[in-house]
Regions:
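Short strand-edge motifs at loop-to-beta-strand transitions and within beta-strands
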Residues: 602-604
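Short, glycine-anchored, charge-dense loop/turn motifs used at functional sites
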Residues: 585-592, 614
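Beta-propeller-forming repeat regions
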Residues: 1-550, 630
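Surface-exposed loops/turns
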Residues: 567, 610-611
């Protein structure tokens, strides 16, 4: 079953895109309609998203699709989409993992198929001091790939190995072969623009290329840990100006070129744009392109920091519309959440689980982010036609991803917990609480030791064709699938994903997690996948989300319950007005006690409850608490 997910920014919504954190952008005509479509690459998870441009004159209309995903090569950390051979098709320059360089894919697409051919690997070289040497570009450095000398072929600017000065690698394709299709470079300038980066902060020193001249430079301990480099004529004088952003700093610095056509010389620096400077943690990268189809390039900005915890999670794609011209731009901030406005985006991380949150017999989605804040997508539809509404409950949990399931079929819910290590702990419910049975359940370990010592395991249990299966999300982005049995080590059966959900990819963004259930009662399991991008992706169905804004929010201190654990009488104190009833449910979602609220403090008689774990729900599920009955 294949679904083309539509996202219509400004006119409609597609909530199930998956969230955005730290993005780079490109343009390419994917559907051959004469309009360049938008490519979005989120480095926090190495996800490439394709948006078809359906906007008319002065209209913003981008529709998300997965149709072209498999045609693109696997991209890592950064990407530049640019046509290096002049054939009208954008090629791909991207980071070469493990080599501190870049590899190149040539666009060899036809009208029938999108296709790329790897032409440079493991890294692109230039002639430097008597030999061909790797053009240095780390995972934390975003290079400028642009025609610097006006001869038509693309040159490269990137910080040198010492990290203080910008090096120019001149493309000699035109000089040697009188064509654009060769990638032959020579380092011709070790201090392009005559500008140097301070060792101590993000200050740039102008008109200097000498160590110790107007700069404090420690040759033994260079500070440079990453930067983004972008060049563009921003004042209409025909000279390429320089935009820089530095790791750990939120802004863009514009350095104005006061040199000439033969030599760049930066003479002035200022925050950019002047009308509303960028303030995005950390190390923003700009991209100039016409977003609203008026023939004038606008500005997109997003964080570039390789550290996933350093980026902005919810307002991480700033769009500035150009009210001027390309020669004399006037960038005015339009939105801080371009494309994110119409999707479910919980910030950093999204770990879903299926639960009847409010005891109404409908399956809801509970989503926890990386910082352990909980949000609920309340099902306001029907059994056959679910529809979700977003509710913030502002509960906080420790980082331990857990799921409840009667694993041993004794009528008591058991508890399975994931952890940072990537293993699982299994607790059996016994009526008085939970007893630890194994802290290495099924010998599950989802760590990828080649890249990390952490796993961030997120478990969920579900039945498929009469068998109990265990899905475990992971830091590396894979969803592992195991067959639960009495054996010490569970059998991995991840191949079953192609049977359960044929259109689901093998790898998602980093810190993946899934919830699996038949949400619409059609006999087919739906799979809801979250990742560090902070959003959700839905497979095997299309279910609407009626309201992407939070309908109501409770603060964590607005309700107090005591004592907990409780023997007979549970006191519920609401510190703000609430309506309707208070409910007590078991963890299957069955309502056991329902009582009207008559005062700010309500006393519930729970003496007849069987000892165990219960859920207290207030104000139609807007706020919930767990308590233990002794």
């Amino acid at each position: 079953m294949f679904f083309l997910w539509l996202f219509h920014w400004g006119m409609g919504q597609n909530p199930w895109v998956g969230g955005l954190n730290a993005c780079q952008f490109g343009r390419m005509d994917l559907d051959h309609d004469g309009q360049r479509d938008l490519l979005v690459f989120d480095r926090h998870g190495n996800r490439l998203l394709c948006y078809i441009n359906k906007g008319g004159d002065r209209a913003i209309d981008y529709r998300y699709t997965t149709e072209y995903d498999e045609a693109f090569p696997r991209l890592t950390d950064w990407v530049v989409f640019v046509d290096y051979d002049g054939d009208g098709l954008e090629d791909i320059f991207t980071y070469s993992k493990g080599w501190a360089g870049m590899k190149v894919y040539h666009n060899v697409s036809t009208a029938e198929a999108l296709e790329f051919e790897l032409v440079v690997s493991p890294y692109l070289t230039s002639w430097q001091g008597g030999g061909e040497v790797n053009i240095l570009s780390t995972d934390a450095d975003y290079p400028a790939i642009v025609d610097l000398d006006g001869d038509g072929d693309l040159d490269i600017l990137t910080f040198g190995v010492m990290g203080t000065f910008i090096e120019k690698h001149r493309n000699l394709s035109m000089e040697r072969y009188d064509c654009l299709d060769s990638l032959v470079f020579e380092r011709t300038d070790m201090c392009w623009g005559r500008v140097g980066e301070s060792e101590e902060d993000n200050v740039m020193y102008l008109d200097t290329c000498l160590f110790g001249y107007g700069m404090k430079v420690n040759r033994d301990d260079f500070r440079h840990r990453g930067a983004t480099v972008t060049v563009r004529d921003l004042n209409g004088d025909g000279l390429l100006d320089l935009l820089l952003a530095d790791v750990d700093y939120p802004g863009l610095t514009l350095l104005v070129n006061g040199g000439d056509a033969s030599e760049a010389l930066m003479v002035q620096q200022m925050d950019f744009p002047t009308s509303h400077p960028v303030d995005l943690p950390s190390m923003p990268v700009p991209f100039f392109t016409d977003i609203n189809n008026d023939g004038v390039d606008d500005l997109l900005v997003s964080p570039f920091d390789p550290n996933p915890m350093a980026s902005e999670g919810k307002e991480s794609v700033w769009l500035y519309l150009n009210h001027g011209s390309n020669a004399h731009p006037d960038f005015q901030l339009y939105t801080k959440s371009f494309l994110q406005d119409g999707m479910l985006d919980f910030g950093k991380g999204a770990y879903p689980s299926v639960v009847d949150w409010d005891g109404d017999g409908l399956l809801d989605l509970k989503v926890r982010d990386f910082e352990s804040k909980v949000t609920v997508l309340k099902n306001v539809g029907t059994l056959q036609q679910p529809a979700f509404e977003l509710i913030a409950v502002d509960d906080k949990e420790e980082w331990a991803a857990s799921c409840y399931y009667d694993v041993n079929q004794d009528g008591q819910l058991d508890l399975v917990e994931g952890n940072i290590k990537g293993t699982l702990s299994y607790y059996q419910g016994n009526g008085d609480g939970f007893e630890l049975i194994s802290d290495f359940w099924g010998e599950v370990d989802v760590r990828d030791y080649q890249t990390s010592y952490y796993g961030y395991s997120v478990p969920t249990l579900f039945e498929y064709h009469g068998e109990l299966l265990l899905c475990v999300g992971s830091e590396q982005g894979k969803l592992f699938l195991y067959r639960v049995s009495d054996d010490t080590a569970f059998e991995e059966v991840s191949y079953l994903w192609k049977e359960i959900c044929p259109e689901m990819p093998d790898v998602f963004g980093i810190h993946s997690a899934a919830a699996v259930a038949d949400l619409n009662g059609d006999g087919v399991l739906e799979v809801v996948v979250g990742n560090f991008g902070g959003g959700l992706q839905l497979y095997n169905a299309m279910i609407p989300v009626n309201n992407l804004g939070i309908s109501e929010e409770w603060d964590d201190m607005d309700i107090v319950i005591f004592p907990n654990p409780v023997l007979s009488q549970l006191h519920v104190v609401a510190l703000r007005h609430c309506s309707n009833d208070v409910r007590v449910m078991d963890l299957f979602g069955r309502v056991l006690i329902e009582q009207a609220i008559t005062d700010s403090e309500t006393v519930l008689d729970v003496s007849n409850l069987v000892p165990g774990v219960y859920l207290l729900s207030l104000d139609r599920g807007l706020v919930n608490r767990i308590f233990l009955k002794r």
